[in-house]
Amino acid sequence: MLNIGPFSFHSRLLLGTGKFPDFDVQQKAIDVSEAEVLTFAVRRMDIFDAKQPNLLEKLDVKKYTLLPNTAGAKNAEEAVRIAKLAKASGLCDMIKVEVIGDDRTLLPDPVETLKASEMLLEEGFIVLPYTSDDVVLARKLQELGVHAIMPGASPIGSGLGIVNPLNLSFIIEQATVPVIVDAGIGSPADAAFAMELGADGVLLNTAVSGAKDPIKMAQAMKLSIEAGRLGFEAGRIGRKRCATASSPLEGMSVVE
């Protein structure tokens, strides 16, 4: 089970809802992924205008936990305003904090992310900050009392996969809250690797919505995350420089 604050989920796959070709493909991909948590950008959806069609109208929202995010925020104050808008609309108190500090790389602003997380915790939100693979920043966020850490594998939408597995492993080893690898996942192998490192979950979007067949990719991601978690729990063998025979040598007959 993936436990985040008061919530418990069977699926360790969190799925973003943007960039799908159409609502039908989106719905089918969500269904086969078996994701229980769906994230969306509040600023890209007019949640107060009943005339504007959006995700919330198309989905049976009772089946899912919705995770609004603060994408588009440039500072802590903007992130808090967006989070409060989501809460005022009757959505979940759980919020993904996303404060971008650089438009080219879309990497998060560490100072504003810390500030926004602290402010939202004081407001009673369940806070999941998107952060870089900075080990010290992850620890400081954890010390604030956030409910999960969401380090990026690589820049948002890049599909580069996990570019710094060492840092991710350090973040996971020191964590006392769930670690959900977020951003940059490009393939099922990337998702499985994140889980093999010991991540508690993976959040992805473009890897599915941008695939040639988003529905098949959603299923592939589901299976790879399950396989990666099983592999982590099973415990991989150690790496060795030299070969070790897989068959015992004792009792073998000698051919003369």
Swiss-Prot record:
InterPro entries xrefs: Aldolase_TIM, Thiazole_synthase_ThiG, ThiG
Keywords per UniProt: Cytoplasm, Schiff base, Thiamine biosynthesis, Transferase
Subcellular location per the Swiss-Prot or TrEMBL entry: Cytoplasm
Enzyme class of the recorded protein, top EC level: transferase
Annotated Pfam families: ThiG
GO MF term list: thiazole synthase activity
EC number(s) from the headed UniProt entry: 2.8.1.10
GO CC annotation: cytoplasm
Function: Catalyzes the rearrangement of 1-deoxy-D-xylulose 5-phosphate (DXP) to produce the thiazole phosphate moiety of thiamine. Sulfur is provided by the thiocarboxylate moiety of the carrier protein ThiS. In vitro, sulfur can be provided by H(2)S.
Protein name: Thiazole synthase
Upper lineage: Bacteria, Bacillati, Bacillota, Bacilli, Bacillales
